[in-house]
């Protein structure tokens, strides 16, 4: 899974480029203004595997906070299966198998179907149609300049042969965001170019066809130190293929085994040796998960993480002691997630119904936007009697 798929933001007004010309051509009420008062979030993940603690720290925890903040009128959480197929077209079973796994991880983390609409991307065909119309507003060279696209192409070794669907996924993401009139999108800094491209598409569409689409604002994660957790082997990124992930669905024994095998400072060979906390995965994980109350419960000799770090850097503290503390901290954090997941695993029919109802609600919302888009473009032929007059 990938967090596409994570501050308080307000809806920003769009620049009215070519506004006078637009109003003369399309003398109608702004569809964007009709929806302006609502605060809406869209976010999601690609279902290419079970979600891990990196997803939890990077986006899921923040989503639950936003969901429970009461600041947003609507929250849409998308399982981006169509996007996952852009680089898994020959293995659709991989995507299919992980739809329920991602949904279970969502519910286990505390995402609430009463407060958020959880849906499957491919069950909302309006998104594909919007993508097709937006493609006409973006050049190939502009997509090629997108730093995120460049990085993703390189990561997947697509340089020699890029699937068209994969190449166009920034346009698809713009369709996802605008279809639900998202006013805010939680993203990591590495995804900022995607949001910028979405804003460009919104500006272009509104300048050509009149104010119709809503421009999203960006919500950056508040804990920037934990934007991306390293793998337990010290590699820069958690990866299923590298086997260096701690999954949200891991058992208590699995988590303990992985924590105790974690990479640490390679120069910290003896207890009395000074240790380095910078770039040390154990301390990066503690930065992400540890709270002051954990010390009172599990390590009362220390008041906070700074004290623990100081002792480790000074020498006289073994890695095993730090790892045992980290294991206690993570078990404390993951236990309620594990418990909720067990409940939903025993109620899979309910999970299926949540996805079905969520997808139906999402399609109804996207259909409204598509109707507005087609009206703005004057291609709503059977809803517009002016066609009969040759206008």
Give the location of each predicted region.
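Structured ligand/cofactor/substrate-binding pocket environments in proteins
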Residues: 51-60, 75-76, 81, 91-95, ...
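Low-complexity, intrinsically disordered or signal/transmembrane-proximal segments
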Residues: 9-10, 21, 26, 35
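Cysteine-centered motifs
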Residues: 4-6
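N-terminal Rossmann-like or analogous alpha/beta NTP/dinucleotide-binding catalytic cores
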Residues: 32-175, 293, 332-334, 342
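Conserved nucleotide- and phosphate/pyrophosphate-binding catalytic cores
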Residues: 193, 199-391
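A short secondary-structure junction signal
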Residues: 145-146, 182-183, 210, 240-241
């Amino acid at each position: 899974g990938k967090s596409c798929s994570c501050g308080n933001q307000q809806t920003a007004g769009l620049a009215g480029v070519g506004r006078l010309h637009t109003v003369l051509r399309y003398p109608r009420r702004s569809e964007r203004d009709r929806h302006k008062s609502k605060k809406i979030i869209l976010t999601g993940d690609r279902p290419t595997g079970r979600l891990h603690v990196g997803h939890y720290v990077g986006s899921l925890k923040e989503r639950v906070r936003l969901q429970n903040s009461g600041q947003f009128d609507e929250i849409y959480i998308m399982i981006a299966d169509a996007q996952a197929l852009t680089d898994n077209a020959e293995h659709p079973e991989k995507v299919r198998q992980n739809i329920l796994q991602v949904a279970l991880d969502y519910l286990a983390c505390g995402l609430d179907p009463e407060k958020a609409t959880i849906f499957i991307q491919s069950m909302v065909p309006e998104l594909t149609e919007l993508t097709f119309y937006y493609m006409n507003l973006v050049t190939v060279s502009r997509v090629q300049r997108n730093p995120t696209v460049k990085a993703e192409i390189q990561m997947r070794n697509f340089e020699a042969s890029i699937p068209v669907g994969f190449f166009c996924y920034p346009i698809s993401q713009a369709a996802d965001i605008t279809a639900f009139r998202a006013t805010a999108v939680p993203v990591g800094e590495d995804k900022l170019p995607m949001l910028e491209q979405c804003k460009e598409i919104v500006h272009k569409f509104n300048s050509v066809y009149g104010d119709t689409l809503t421009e999203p604002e960006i919500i950056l994660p508040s804990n920037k130190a934990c934007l991306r957790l390293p793998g337990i082997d010290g590699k820069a990124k958690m990866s299923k293929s590298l086997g260096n992930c701690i999954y949200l669905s891991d058992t208590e024994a699995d988590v303990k085994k992985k924590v105790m095998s974690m990479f640490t400072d390679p120069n910290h060979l003896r207890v009395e040796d000074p240790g380095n906390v910078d770039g040390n995965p154990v301390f990066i994980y503690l930065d992400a998960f540890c709270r002051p109350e954990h010390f009172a419960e599990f390590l009362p000799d220390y008041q906070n993480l700074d004290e623990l770090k100081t002792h480790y850097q000074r020498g006289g503290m073994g890695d095993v002691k730090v790892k045992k503390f980290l294991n206690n901290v993570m078990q404390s954090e993951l236990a309620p997630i594990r418990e909720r997941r067990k409940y939903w695993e025993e109620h899979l029919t309910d999970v299926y119904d949540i996805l079905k109802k969520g997808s139906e609600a999402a399609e109804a919302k996207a259909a409204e936007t598509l109707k507005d888009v087609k009206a703005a473009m004057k291609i709503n032929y059977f809803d517009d009697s002016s066609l009969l007059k040759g206008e």
